[in-house]
Amino acid sequence: MKNLKEDFPIFAAKAKENEPFIYLDSAATTQKPQQVIDAVANFYTSSYATVNRAIYSSSRNVTEAYAAVREKVRKWVSAASDSEIVFTRGTTAGLNLLAISVNDLWIPKGGVVLVSEAEHHANVLSWEIACRRRGSLVKKIRVHDSGLIDLDDLEKLLNEGAQFVSIPHVSNVTGCVQPLQQVAELVHRYDAYLAVDGAQGAPHLPIDVQLWDVDFYVFSSHKIYGPTGIGVLYGKKDLLDQLPPVEGGGDMVAIYDHQNPEYLPAPMKFEAGTPNIAGVLGLGAALDYLDGLSAKFIYDKEIALTTYLHKELLEIPGVEILGPSIEEPRGALIGMTIDGAHPLDLGFLLDLRGIAVRTGHQCAQPAMERWNVGHVLRVSLGIYNDEDDIDQFILVLQDSLDKIRR
């Protein structure tokens, strides 16, 4: 089988400089394949124009290419219509858009939004800030040691009157995969709405928002091999039509009236101003690349590698893996602590040998509190990784532990 590293120029560039480079931080951001880099460069060098605003040919051509990406995203998440796809600046921006708009429309003063007790900051601070301004409340759903939502606690909080639930698809700390279809059924039984932070789900798992019946799903381009500064908010069409816009500007209003403006329908009413055209085109190129591999191939490869990594780590004394057991569903990442070794020290020693991992609280201090740890060493995989990367990581990790424990 082809070595997928060949599609990502950074690996050849590092090799040319004789610089070791094993990238195990794809949960933070992914490396970019050549066709994504080419798509962005070609837009700026040979086809640059604005979109949705002009009748000249170069603008029409770019507008057509831009619209085609919305359809590619629709297919990637299995949405019913491309009008359910809103382009944002990323997962964080999408969650903040939702938090503000949802509070404006559906959450009364004193109302309740639910998040889990182990969230990334993007899916807790966004809601806390918006709810504080609204006068509504954020309450926390308990999670089990595996990281799974406690469905009994969720039902208790829904029964008490919560109006909205926002949870991660895959934890960026533990890799735990939430049973979205089961959660959605429970949430809708109590006439509430469900949003999903899909930052760690969309790049690694087959996505089917219709099958799961989630109301909203949010993710970032840069974690799915596309450019930074662009993201996606999926929302059911009837719900997006109800929600008010949170930003004003060009290309989102049909008729301006200073007392009662008539906004364009979704998704345009949520995309004020000149968009990140290069980012959207780069995202389209990333999805083309992934479609050439297939979501099933990506999932199968990454699950096999993650399981292999998990088994190897279990052989190292003192390693404590957070979240799911080796038999339970897990995304393409593992967070761990190691007795007698601080994650920051290990991260430094690994970097000296050309191995990139994430250390610290992972922008998820609530999760650190839930598992009673201060810092975590996280290994996260991408489609370019292979068993050789894992073998080298394990070798250097053991060597680093020997140095620290002397």
Curated annotation (Swiss-Prot):
- One Pfam family linked to the record: Aminotran_5
Question: What's the superkingdom here?
Answer: Bacteria
List, in alphabetical order, the GO biological process terms annotated in this UniProt record.
cysteine metabolic process
Give the matching InterPro entries: Aminotrans_V_dom, Aminotrans_V_PyrdxlP_BS, Cys_dSase_SufS, Cysteine_dSase, PyrdxlP-dep_Trfase, PyrdxlP-dep_Trfase_major, PyrdxlP-dep_Trfase_small
GO MF annotation, one? pyridoxal phosphate binding
Q: Which residues carry this modification: N6-(pyridoxal phosphate)lysine?
A: K223
Tell me the active site.
C363 (cysteine persulfide intermediate)
EC number(s) on file: 2.8.1.7
Cofactor(s) demanded? pyridoxal 5'-phosphate
The reactions it catalyses are:
(sulfur carrier)-H + L-cysteine = (sulfur carrier)-SH + L-alanine
- Keywords from the named record: Pyridoxal phosphate, Transferase
Entry function: Catalyzes the removal of elemental sulfur and selenium atoms from L-cysteine, L-cystine, L-selenocysteine, and L-selenocystine to produce L-alanine.
Q: Which family does it belong to?
A: Belongs to the class-V pyridoxal-phosphate-dependent aminotransferase family. Csd subfamily.
Tell me the protein's name.
Probable cysteine desulfurase
